[in-house]
A protein has these predicted regions:
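Residue-level signature of transmembrane alpha-helix interfaces in integral membrane proteins
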Residues: 19, 25, 77, 99-104
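Short beta-strand segments
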Residues: 58-60, 81, 121
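Short, structured patches in soluble enzyme cores that scaffold and shape functional sites
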Residues: 8, 84, 122-124
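Gly/Ser-rich helix-loop-strand patches that form or flank binding pockets
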Residues: 67, 71-89
């Protein structure tokens, strides 16, 4: 993968220190990233995902991942949750392992990483 869409929970990364660290690592790999554009309530603005993006990295917790899934309904974008909280069931990568996960996504480990493709149920 060559291009990432970064979705940050600013309540868990107020000064964007973690986001900056992850974006810098992506750049070191020679890859591109785009920070999600959000409205005043923190929802991702519709139609703002660049067409060349291949994967969304969701920095937060399970709630952040669920919100991203809802906000990106209709987009064919796999998401990988990077947990910035204490416990995450859906956000499967712990912060300490973000470099390994990005390496795998970039193909350097020559192994596939399972990306979560969740769809919002019509009942929710």
């Amino acid at each position: 993968m060559d291009s990432f869409y970064i979705i940050t929970n600013i309540l868990k990364d107020k000064d964007y220190a973690v986001t900056d660290k992850i974006c810098n690592y992506i750049e070191q790999k020679g890859k591109k990233w785009t920070l999600a554009k959000k409205d005043e309530e923190g929802h991702i603005l519709p139609g703002t995902v660049p067409s060349d993006v291949e994967c969304g990295l969701v920095l937060g917790g399970d709630g952040t991942l669920i919100r991203a899934i809802r906000d990106l309904e209709g987009e064919e974008l796999p998401l990988l949750g990077i947990n910035l909280g204490t416990l995450g069931y859906l956000a499967e990568v712990e912060l300490k392992d973000y470099q390994y996960a990005i390496d795998r996504l970039c193909g350097e480990e020559h192994a596939a990483i399972e990306l979560r493709m969740m769809q919002r149920s019509s009942n929710t």
